[in-house]
């Protein structure tokens, strides 16, 4: 970049490329470096495959345990509250970190992506929680664009709803958070959302349609058994994610050592 500071499209000439000096270790050292980096890459790929398998296992267990033989109910029946987000852009605060405003961009594969999270100050938090103050165990659902994914809010953070989201609060006497989270992400419910979207210019789910989502309601005992299974899988997932993070840091360090 220092070679092309004033051009619109960054580029290097053939002369500049030919002038670049790169280290050239002995061939046996090159082979050793390649072997070490390949091993690190293989382990990273393995950890990612293991994470994908855990996701498949959770979905497979859900299909195995729950079926249409149970009473079919609406989301409105099993929830004490279903509320839409405020239809306004939050006033974000680059300093405050106490009040995360969760948007569709933070809802990825059923989990919260904290890397892109934005935050609001206390006054904006109060404004955006007038309808309902989110609590741990609530489900935040992406209702526009890449709609249909959702997350369970964890304890320890004062969330408010960002744009293009809605919140489901399960009635604890009827439905667990883990079951509702998984059923809202299931193919049958996604198909209902797709059907309600027919002809829409901008893909989205209306709150009236979301309240009418239909799905089986198994006994709480069975829901809790599934929840225990998911929690055990999550422990395994955390271990693998920690291993993956260490491997990625190690690979970057090796790249820096060999080529930096």
Describe the residue ranges of each PLM region.
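Short, ligand-facing micro-motifs at secondary-structure edges
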Residues: 1-3, 108-120, 139-162, 178-182, ...
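Short, well-ordered loop/turn sites that connect or cap secondary structure elements
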Residues: 54, 133-134
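Residue-level "contact hotspot" at macromolecular interaction interfaces
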Residues: 130-133, 158
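A short glycine-rich beta-alpha junction/loop motif
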Residues: 4-28, 143, 159-166, 175-178, ...
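Non-catalytic DNA-recognition/assembly elements of restriction-modification systems
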Residues: 19-35, 46-86, 212-224, 231-260
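Short, solvent-exposed loop/turn positions at domain surfaces
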Residues: 6, 127-128, 199, 238
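Low-complexity, Lys/Gly-biased intrinsically disordered segments
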Residues: 70-112, 125-129
């Amino acid at each position: 970049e220092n070679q092309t500071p004033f051009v619109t499209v960054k580029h290097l000439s053939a002369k500049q490329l030919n002038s670049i000096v790169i280290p050239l270790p002995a061939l046996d050292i090159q082979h050793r470096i390649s072997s070490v980096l390949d091993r690190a890459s293989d382990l990273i790929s393995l950890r990612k495959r293991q994470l994908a398998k855990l996701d498949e296992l959770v979905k497979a267990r859900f299909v195995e345990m729950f079926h249409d033989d149970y009473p079919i109910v609406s989301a409105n029946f099993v929830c004490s509250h279903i509320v839409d987000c405020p239809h306004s852009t939050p006033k974000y605060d680059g300093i405050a970190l106490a009040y995360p405003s969760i948007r569709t961009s933070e809802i990825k594969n059923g989990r919260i992506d904290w890397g892109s999270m934005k935050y609001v100050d206390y006054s904006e938090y109060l404004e955006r929680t007038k309808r309902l103050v989110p609590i741990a165990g609530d489900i935040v659902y992406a209702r526009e664009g890449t709609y249909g994914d959702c997350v369970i809010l964890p304890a320890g953070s004062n969330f408010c709803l960002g744009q293009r989201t809605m919140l489901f609060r399960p009635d604890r006497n009827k439905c667990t958070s883990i079951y509702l989270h998984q059923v809202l992400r299931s193919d049958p419910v996604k198909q209902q959302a797709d059907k309600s979207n027919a002809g829409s210019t901008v893909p989205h789910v209306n709150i009236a349609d979301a309240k009418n989502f239909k799905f089986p309601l198994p006994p709480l005992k069975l829901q809790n058994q599934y929840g225990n299974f998911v929690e055990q899988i999550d422990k395994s997932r955390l271990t693998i994610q920690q291993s993956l993070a260490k491997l990625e840091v190690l690979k970057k360090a090796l790249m820096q050592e060999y080529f930096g």
